[in-house]
């Protein structure tokens, strides 16, 4: 919004008096020669911004008419050009999907072969298949339990290391009066060592 100026008979410029929202009037203010109001001051642009604004969108020598058919020929709803990374990710997803389908197809063909072998072969293979299914299912909980044990072992080792550091600091005289918590930590050392041994034997 431009500031309304009023010029008097002597040629002096004034900012016209305006009414405030509460109904009172602001006085008109004299403006010095060459004054530019804040809202009319152009925004500063460094040389790089100016360069990129002045830079044409098309390469030199290429007319805008030549580019119009290319943009029009692109199908509506067509995907924009993908970056190299996006293309690579799409290929990976596609490959994974194909491998998964391939694996499912192979498993299906194996089960069909077992079924088509005949009645005599089918009877003993049925318990084997039922035995194989629980072992495959039990592998996952085993691996989860193993990782859980590994985490516990790591945590216990860390606690033992802290207890040892605390004991060394007390022996070196860095801590003259250990707090109640620190004494409890030292007392728990044997229990931590036993728990760690049990877990390591369980693995």
Swiss-Prot record:
Major location category of this protein: cytoplasm
Subcellular location: Cytoplasm; Nucleus, Nucleolus; Nucleus, Nucleoplasm
Annotated stretches, region: eIF2A-like: 151-203
Coiled coil: 81-116, 144-203
InterPro entries linked: PYM1, WIBG_mago-bd, WIBG_N_sf
Biased composition (Low complexity): 121-140
GO cellular component terms, semicolon-separated: cytoplasm; exon-exon junction complex; nucleolus; nucleoplasm
Residue segments, region Disordered: 1-30, 54-149
Region (Required for interaction with MAGOH and RBM8A): 1-32
Alphabetical keyword list: Coiled coil, Cytoplasm, Nonsense-mediated mRNA decay, Nucleus, Phosphoprotein, Translation regulation
Post-translational modification Phosphoserine, affected residues: 63, 116
GO molecular function per UniProt: ribosome binding; RNA binding
Amino acid composition bias (Basic and acidic residues), ranges on this chain: 97-113
Biased composition (Basic residues): 85-96
One BP annotation, GO: positive regulation of translation
Positions of post-translational Phosphothreonine modification: 71
Pfam families recorded: Mago-bind
SMART domains: Mago-bind
Free-text comment on this protein's domains from its UniProt entry: The eIF2A-like region shares sequence similarity with eIF2A and mediates the interaction with the 40S ribosomal subunit and the 48S preinitiation complex.
Subunit structure, interactors included: Interacts (via N-terminus) with MAGOH and RBM8A; the interaction is direct. Associates (eIF2A-like region) with the 40S ribosomal subunit and the 48S preinitiation complex.
PANTHER family named among the record's database cross-references: PARTNER OF Y14 AND MAGO, PYM PROTEIN
UniProt family annotation: Belongs to the pym family.
Function: Key regulator of the exon junction complex (EJC), a multiprotein complex that associates immediately upstream of the exon-exon junction on mRNAs and serves as a positional landmark for the intron exon structure of genes and directs post-transcriptional processes in the cytoplasm such as mRNA export, nonsense-mediated mRNA decay (NMD) or translation. Acts as an EJC disassembly factor, allowing translation-dependent EJC removal and recycling by disrupting mature EJC from spliced mRNAs.
Name of the protein in its database record: Partner of Y14 and mago
Species classification: Eukaryota, Metazoa, Chordata, Craniata, Vertebrata
């Amino acid at each position: 919004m431009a500031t309304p100026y009023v010029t008097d008979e002597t040629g002096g410029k004034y900012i016209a008096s305006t009414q405030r929202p509460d109904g009172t009037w602001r006085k008109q203010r004299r403006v010095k020669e060459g004054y530019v109001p804040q809202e009319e001051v152009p925004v500063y642009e460094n040389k790089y911004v100016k360069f990129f604004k002045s830079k044409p969108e098309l390469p030199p020598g290429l007319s805008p008419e030549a580019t119009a058919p290319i943009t029009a020929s692109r199908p509506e709803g067509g995907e924009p050009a993908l970056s190299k990374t996006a293309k690579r990710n799409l290929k990976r997803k596609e490959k994974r999907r194909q491998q998964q389908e391939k694996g499912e197809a192979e498993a299906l063909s194996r089960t069909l072969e077992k079924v088509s072998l005949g009645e005599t072969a089918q009877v003993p293979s049925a318990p084997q298949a039922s035995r194989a299914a629980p072992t495959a299912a039990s592998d996952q909980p085993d691996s989860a339990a193993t990782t859980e044990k590994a985490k516990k072992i790591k945590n216990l080792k860390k606690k033992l290391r802290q207890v040892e550091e605390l004991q060394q600091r007390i022996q070196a005289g860095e801590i003259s009066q250990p707090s109640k918590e620190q004494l409890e930590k030292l007392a728990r050392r044997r229990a931590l060592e036993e728990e760690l041994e049990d877990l390591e034997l369980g693995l």
